[in-house]
Curated annotation (Swiss-Prot):
PANTHER family: DNA SEGMENT, CHR 5, ERATO DOI 579, EXPRESSED. ATP binds at residues 88-95. Residues 146-165, 198-388, 1113-1137, 1347-1396 are annotated as: Disordered. Residues 198-221, 286-300, 1365-1376 have a biased composition (Low complexity). The keyword Metal-binding does not apply. One of its GO terms (molecular function) is ATP binding. InterPro entries: DUF4603. The keyword Nucleotide-binding applies. This is Uncharacterized protein KIAA0232. Keywords: ATP-binding, Nucleotide-binding, Phosphoprotein. Residues 242-268, 1386-1396 have a biased composition (Basic and acidic residues). The lineage of its organism: Eukaryota, Metazoa, Chordata, Craniata, Vertebrata.
Length: 1396
């Protein structure tokens, strides 16, 4: 029996390698074994001389040397894994070369020598012994070969006749030892197991197995086999998801059924297989046999394997299996769904879905019998199979399987579409007749979490998220399969092998935020990038494939990467502009605001693709492809090419470009990017730092991520171009604050599912058309009459100094712009676009060229080259933006947004407000950029080496708080953040705060050579009302989902975001820089779960960036939202602009600027955690007294500067102060606590009061308690207060802008919203209360967070502070003093911020 065993063990493997002649091989092996006796005896003696156990080692060494098969795959995998661990992303080819450097014989000798040396104390003589042994064995073998030759030449000797063939031996063995399982034994399977003819057997098994690895209930055949077999087929197993293994049992049953029929066919098939190697034939056998086929069948499969090798490397056996399954039949489509591996195989794993059912499996087997060509033909006809697959997939959502990561992925199959196997198995996409398999595959490649919806409206969640630099970014992206995806452009990010190879794991470490298995980082993870993890590969995919994505539904901003330009805002008319516009570095488009929180769970993905990081990133709320975005229209994808879809597509999310952070509404970013390619580039070019906010890790201190995502906690990541994708996502850009266009591989904005795809498409188209802005250089030439971003977002028309001002819309720091590392403002743009509906004024973190600041207004100026297109887009606001992120527009969606944009023609600013160095703008503004981040309007200083600032011209009308906010521009200069009240420009810019750490220029300013790759901190006012305040809802019923998003209420939808962008250098050193995102949750633990404010409300993530974020509050007065009227506002702006220079002086002391933030931090400590505060550099200053002083100082300094508040603001301050005093008096009479509250209330009244009561430590009482308790205690007092407030509100801010009732309403609303106790006030001022309540519902959540964060500071003050750098911070404390100054604006703005 030993000979038989030996033959089986030794002979079969050799047989598998030798292929179809098991008999002769076995005979020769047997004869050789018989002749080994003398050699073994001699070897034993020699070993004994060396002190080595002869019994053990003689047989082992002989086995080593005689074994003629070597598992290169295993070695390569091992090497790859090791190399990956070492951070050297080596391509499989390299490892192969290394492996093949030594001949098999040399390797065996080496192994034997090593083995003996390990067993012997003496190392001398071992090599000689082995050499001699090898010589003896060679002699023996030659002798045996001669004998065999003679025997073969002559008639078969009786001995030979008697010797059983390998097959006979197997049969004899199983007769003697029948299998325990009922499953009929397939000799071929057994042979395969023994033979280890991996490629052949695997390929055949894969082809034979009709079950798609991920899609089918039954696991791949190999799973059916033994673990050992699985090990041999480890690559296939690796590709096969764990669930497949679970399915393996059912598959076993099926196989047993099939095997009964197929086994009978096997003998013939076996022979035929060897001859014809038809995939189909092999498959039936493999089905019956499981994954393994007989050795000969495996040999037969070799031809098959070769074919598959075109698409797949041998290692991707599972993939091959899937592919062959697909070839078996039907599943090219399924293959698309199954994954990149299947997709790589042209036939795809269409059959995999069908294999879920026995019947389908049988069909597959039959199809497998067909020639490959036949099966390929049948693919199109396999609708039934497709349906089965779809059903199976629908029944079972593919979950990420540990095997994907734990099992070595041998050769990663790099499908043409560059789908990673992991992606493939991770989510199988439904067959989408509308989508080409490649397109869908590409999409899934780029966005693992992308949800692809069929034209049948099957929404496929490709993945929960995307892997970015080892980060698994959760972001279900819903892609409307109806959307026309051209080729693989969709999501196949041009995997930049260069990047991958150049990037080391160390760079990717921070992406572990997502708790991704290290294996995900495994090079196996990345098909395209052989040495790189699939995730990295996805993240790093570069522009190579980006071009392909143009037509694809790469909502992931495939076009973003266009020419390294920002494609986000690309208009369909100008693809180049869109790309560049989209993000200077799509790589920087790491972050989005996943503002469309509730409407699309998938959209909720932190990054690019909804919840799961779509190719464009976590991710996260910002689903690159939102089902609703894409579902309604295929346009988004086409729009991507056009670039128009991009804006609408991206829900409000922040896109971190190397040089800019852009909040995009995914809708805005929607494939509308003129160049799907661009988005792909954005995704693939750079490691996209899609900090998929799947984890709070983004907020982890070491992450240095400021998670600002309004909805998703998405951090604004600034990462250097070289950053790993996840870093890119990290708002902090921990190591490299700037993205290169290359850096951003994926931007996945969240899109609310609710968002109508058509709306998104329309919105995207409009925006992208407008955003066809080219690189920064192109944009400057454009004069945009479009609304400025601020206008769009805020619905505030910024004064356009002159349309002649060429907005060099920095396509979100268009990649072309010099400071690629700089933060692009593309992110902001989308957010604003969404927030303001069409006028997304996302201020972009400015890299020095204002490129990072591209017009956020997709419609307004979209930084798009085509000003006309932009104008058009502005006029026709896309519905997608606002709605997708926040689901704000669920009701009216497109019309609403259009209305918002149209109504808020405010945004008709010449160019993008923020995009260019202010050259096109008036001189004062030349060096400023206004930006809206996450709905926050900020003015950013773009940092060219010359220090130009891109500024937003003052808005014409300020219909909403955002407009008011627009007046207050946060300008972030290299190290300073300036706030321009009332749209005051450069002269009036007041330094909001100086970064605690000076922003150092990143070493990564690839994009912006002069670009300041410095962390920026800014305070964002997010006014979802934005343009909406101006826009009237055509249908009264169609109101924003968020009652808080009240068009009539200027305060509603103002998000106060403080975020700091900090370059990686700073990030690592400045824990304080790490912004904390408060996602509508009171505690950090809740950060990831945005709270839904109001039933219909969109979930807003209040992003409260702690002082750590280095945000200085912007005072409401600075924002001068009310300015009483547009004229007032403008005058205010003008006035502010004059005095503003003093403001800058005011905050010359960076610490002074930080004090309010510190105060906030102290108050907000419970939100951020003591550790963060303590670790933060602000902590020492976080003392209430210090905070109060600083706040007062800030207010005083602001007042002194008077630049902060224009005269009107000053008047407002006086009015506010008076009103505050009055309120205080009345409230004091009513309630002692109310006094402070009144101050606070007066200052911020509604929002703060409502939100603040929880945080009423010192002053919070004033606003929150006052409103809450006094309301409860003395409604009259509250009413009086409200009236007073109304008076001063009216007088100060809103008398012109909003009727007192409105202010009152807002005030009451905030109170009611934030504190139930405020309801009495609400009752008293019902109209205002309603709005405020709606607003407050949203704001209350945010404020609650903020309140916790701000602690004693009244929430409104906190928001106010954020809004207005210093004064706002202490508004609560200095409510009566400086509060008056800030009260009006701060209430409005604070309310807005609080609201968000």
């Amino acid at each position: 029996m030993r000979p038989v065993c030996t033959v089986v063990v030794d002979g079969l493997p050799s047989e598998s390698t030798s292929s179809s002649y098991p008999g002769p091989v076995s005979v020769s092996d047997m004869s050789l074994l018989h002749a080994l006796g003398p050699v073994q005896t001699w070897l034993g003696q020699e070993l004994e001389k060396c002190g080595i156990d002869a019994m053990i080692y003689s047989r082992y060494i002989l086995s080593l040397l005689l074994h003629d098969s070597y598992d290169y795959d295993l070695q390569e995998q091992e090497n790859d894994i090791l190399s990956w661990e070492k951070g050297a992303y080596k391509k499989w080819g390299r490892s192969k070369k290394k492996c093949s450097d030594l001949t098999l014989e040399e390797m065996k000798k080496q192994a034997a020598v090593q083995c003996l040396r390990s067993a012997s104390d003496e190392s001398s003589g071992i090599e000689t012994l082995v050499e001699e042994l090898c010589c003896r064995l060679k002699d023996l073998q030659s002798e045996q070969e001669e004998k065999i030759h003679k025997k073969l030449e002559g008639s078969p000797s009786p001995e030979e006749e008697l010797s059983p063939t390998a097959k006979d031996q197997v049969e004899m063995y199983y007769e003697a030892f029948p299998p325990l399982s009922e499953k009929p034994v397939c000799l071929q399977e057994i042979m395969t197991v023994w033979n280890k003819s991996k490629p052949c057997s695997y390929s055949s098994s894969s082809s034979s197995s009709t079950v798609p690895p991920a899609s089918t209930d039954t696991s791949s055949p190999k799973d059916c086999n033994s673990e050992s077999e699985a090990v041999r087929e480890r690559s296939s197993v690796a590709s096969v998801p764990m669930h497949e293994k679970a399915q393996s049992r059912s598959r076993h049953e099926k196989e047993s059924k099939l095997s009964s029929s197929t086994i009978e066919e096997k003998p013939a098939f076996y022979k035929r297989q060897i001859r014809h190697k038809p995939e189909g034939k092999t498959r039936p056998r493999s089905w019956s046999s499981g994954s393994s086929e007989a050795g000969s069948s495996s040999s037969g499969n070799q031809g098959e394997l070769k074919a598959s090798m075109k698409y797949v490397k041998v290692r991707h056996k599972a993939r091959e299996i899937r592919n062959r399954k697909g070839r078996n039949g039907q599943n090219r489509h399924s293959l698309k769904h199954c994954g990149k591996a299947e997709r790589g195989v042209h036939a795809g794993s269409g059959g995999s879905s069908s294999s879920s059912s026995n019947g389908s499996i049988r069909q597959l087997c039959k199809r497998g019998k067909r020639p490959a060509k036949e099966t390929g033909r049948s693919d199109s006809g396999n609708t039934a199979v497709k349906d089965l697959y779809v059903d199976s997939r629908n029944n079972k959502e593919y979950k990420e399987e540990p095997l994907w990561y734990t099992e070595p992925i041998a050769e990663y199959f790099v499908p043409l579409s560059r789908k990673s196997k992991l992606e493939t198995t991770y989510r199988n996409r439904e067959d989408t007749s509308t989508l080409t398999a490649e397109a869908v595959e590409d999409l899934s490649d780029s966005v693992r979490g992308l949800c692809i919806s069929n034209s049948n409206i099957h929404r496929t969640y490709l993945a929960a998220g995307t892997f970015i630099d080892g980060h698994f970014v959760e972001m279900p992206a819903v892609i409307n399969e109806d959307i026309d995806l051209a080729g693989t452009s969709l999501c196949s990010l041009p995997e930049d092998n260069k990047y991958l190879d150049d990037i080391h794991l160390s760079e990717l470490t921070h992406f572990y935020e997502v708790d991704i298995d290290q294996s995900m980082l495994d090079p196996g993870a990345s098909e395209t990038m052989q040495g790189e993890s699939r995730i990295l590969n996805m993240i790093r995919q570069k522009s190579k494939e980006n071009t392909d994505f143009e037509a694809e539904c790469c909502i992931v901003l495939d076009g973003m990467e266009l020419q390294g330009e920002r494609a986000i805002w690309t208009d369909s008319t100008s693809s180049v502009g869109a790309e560049g516009f989209f993000l200077q570095d799509l790589g920087n488009l790491a972050q989005f605001w996943e503002c469309c929180s509730s409407s699309s769970g998938d959209a909720d993905g932190e990054s690019f693709g909804g919840d799961s990081p779509v190719r464009l990133s976590p991710i996260l709320d910002s689903t690159m492809l939102s089902s609703h975005i894409l579902a309604g229209n295929q346009e988004p994808f086409s729009n991507i090419n056009e670039g128009s879809g991009i804006n609408s597509c991206f829900s409000v999310f922040e896109v971190q470009c190397s040089n800019s952070v852009l909040p995009f509404s995914f809708e805005t970013l929607n494939l509308g990017s003129e160049h799907a390619d661009s988005s792909a580039n954005m995704l693939g070019k750079t490691q996209s730092r899609l900090l998929i906010w799947t984890k709070n890790s983004a907020f982890e201190e070491n992450e240095h991520c400021s998670n600002l995502s309004t909805r998703t906690c998405s951090p604004w990541s600034h990462s250097e171009e070289a950053r790993s994708d996840n870093e890119t996502l990290n708002i902090q850009f921990e190591e490299s604050t700037q993205f290169t266009a290359e850096d951003i591989n994926y931007v996945v904005p969240r899109v609310s599912s609710d968002f109508v795809d058509e709306e998104l498409l329309d919105f995207l188209q409009d925006e992208t058309c407008q955003q066809n802005s080219r690189t920064l250089g192109e944009i400057p030439t454009l004069v945009f009459k479009k609304r400025s971003k601020l206008e769009s977002v805020c619905g505030i028309q910024l004064e356009q100094k002159a349309e002649s001002k060429n907005f060099e819309t920095t396509h979100a720091c268009s990649e072309s712009s010099p400071h690629g590392d700089g933060y692009s403002s593309g992110v902001i743009k989308d957010i604003w676009t969404k927030m303001v509906g069409r006028s997304s004024v996302a201020a972009v973190e400015t890299e020095r060229t204002g490129e990072e600041l591209f017009s956020t207004d997709v419609n307004n100026y979209c930084c798009c080259l085509d000003t006309e297109a932009k104008m058009e887009a502005l006029q026709e606001p896309s519905r997608a933006v606002q709605r997708s992120e926040y689901h704000l527009w669920e009701g009216q969606k497109e019309n609403m947004e259009k209305r918002a944009f149209v109504s808020s023609e405010l945004s008709k600013v010449d160019g993008g407000d923020y995009t260019t160095p202010s050259k096109p703008w008036d001189v004062a503004q030349d060096k400023e950029n206004t930006f809206i981040l996450g709905g926050v309007y900020g003015e950013l200083k773009t940092f060219n080496s010359d220090g130009e600032w891109a500024v937003v011209p003052p808005g014409h009308t300020k219909g909403s708080l955002l407009q008011c906010a627009a007046s207050d521009v946060v300008t972030i200069a290299g190290t300073d953040v300036f706030m321009t009240p009332g749209n005051s420009f450069a002269p009036g810019h007041r330094q909001l705060w100086k970064p605690f750490v000076s922003f150092e220029q990143s070493d990564m300013p690839k994009r912006g050579e002069n670009g300041v790759n410095k962390g920026f901190s800014f305070i964002f006012h997010e006014d979802l009302l934005g343009a909406c305040s101006n826009f009237q809802v055509e249908d009264p019923g169609l109101e924003y989902s968020l009652s808080s998003f009240d068009l009539s209420n200027p305060f509603s939808q103002v998000l106060h975001v403080e975020c700091s962008f900090e370059p990686e250098g700073i990030a690592s050193f400045s824990p304080s820089f790490k912004p904390k995102s408060i996602l509508c949750s009171d505690s950090d633990s809740e950060v990831f779960h945005p709270r839904i404010c109001g039933v219909e409300r969109t979930q807003y993530r209040a992003i409260r960036i702690s002082p750590r974020t280095h945000f200085r509050p912007i005072s409401a007065s600075e924002l001068s939202p009310g300015g009483g009227s547009e004229s007032e506002f403008e005058s205010e702006k003008d006035e502010a602009s004059v005095p503003i220079p003093s403001h800058v002086d005011v905050f010359e002391d960076p610490q002074a600027d930080l004090k309010p933030l510190e105060e906030d931090a102290e108050k907000e400590g419970h939100y951020y955690g003591k550790l963060e505060l303590e670790s933060g550099k602000f902590l020492p200053r976080l003392k209430k007294s210090g905070m109060e002083k600083s706040a007062q100082t800030s207010l005083d300094s602001q007042e002194e500067a008077t630049g902060i508040l224009p005269k009107q603001n000053q008047c407002l301050e006086c009015n506010f102060n008076e009103s505050l005093e009055i309120n205080l008096e009345s409230s004091a009479a009513n309630c002692k606590i109310m006094t402070q509250c009144e101050e606070e209330m007066s200052e911020f009244c509604s929002c703060k009061a409502g939100c603040q009561f929880p945080a009423c430590e010192d002053n919070p009482v004033s606003s929150g308690q006052l409103e809450e308790f006094p309301v409860l205690n003395t409604d009259v007092q509250e009413v009086t207060r409200n009236q007073e407030k109304q008076s001063w509100w009216e007088k100060a801010l809103y008398s012109p802008l909003f009727p007192t009732s409105e202010c009152e309403e807002c005030y009451t609303n905030a109170k009611g919203e934030n504190g139930i106790e405020e309801c009495p006030d609400a009752k008293e001022t019902p109209s205002r209360e309603e709005r405020l309540l709606d607003f407050n519902r949203v704001s209350s959540v945010y404020e609650a967070r903020c309140t916790g964060e701000r602690g004693s500071e009244t929430k409104p003050n906190g928001l106010h502070r954020k809004m207005c750098s210093s004064a706002s911070s202490d508004t609560g404390d200095t409510g009566s003093e400086a509060g008056g100054e800030w009260v009006g604006p701060s209430r409005e703005e604070l309310f807005s911020r609080t609201h968000l």
